[in-house]
């Protein structure tokens, strides 16, 4: 058969049953603020970001360990305001934020990136600083390469087996950025 003709025929067919319009999700209760001296939760961070960012700002996400929390607490309001990698390529979002800021200079770009993911392409901080781009980076720190640990069984590790080289120290990302 002819693929073009087949697709055209499928598109010409009426829907067999009408699809209802999507309804907005119910609001999720605000997470509790951290107590003094305690670390904030990812949920509190994403909820707070949702409250303070403009609706037309662009989120560039690569925080695989926080993705379900991001989906729950950080609503996306318009097309072309949320970007992420499509197939697990680590190190995408720092440089992607630079590229998106170059492509959309009138928009505020917010990179939400895990600390492990950030280390794959940390030199993008230099590009963002050198080009004076409107990018804000939020580094979600769990002090590990979570994606590698979470997929360790696929790589042949046994349940609970330590994956060498995947724990991170407390990296000072502010100092790294200032060094740019």
Set out the residue ranges of the language-model regions.
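Terminal amphipathic helices with adjacent charged low-complexity linkers/tails
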Residues: 1-21
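Active-site diphosphate/adenylate-binding microenvironment
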Residues: 24-101
């Amino acid at each position: 058969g002819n693929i073009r003709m087949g697709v055209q025929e499928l598109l010409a067919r009426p829907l067999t049953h009408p699809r209802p319009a999507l309804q907005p999700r119910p609001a999720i209760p605000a997470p509790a603020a951290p107590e003094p001296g305690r670390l904030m939760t990812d949920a509190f961070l994403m909820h707070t970001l949702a409250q303070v960012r403009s609706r037309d700002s662009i989120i560039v996400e690569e925080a695989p360990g926080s993705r379900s929390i991001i989906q729950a607490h950080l609503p996306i309001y318009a097309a072309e305001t949320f970007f992420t990698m499509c197939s697990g390529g680590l190190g995408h979002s720092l440089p992607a934020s630079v590229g998106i800021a170059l492509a959309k200079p009138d928009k505020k770009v917010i990179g939400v990136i895990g600390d492990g993911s950030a280390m794959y392409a940390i030199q993008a901080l230099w590009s963002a600083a050198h080009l004076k781009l409107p990018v804000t980076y939020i580094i979600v720190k769990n002090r590990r390469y979570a994606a590698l640990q979470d997929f360790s069984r696929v790589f042949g590790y046994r349940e609970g087996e330590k994956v060498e080289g995947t724990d991170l120290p407390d990296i000072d990302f502010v100092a790294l950025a200032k060094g740019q």
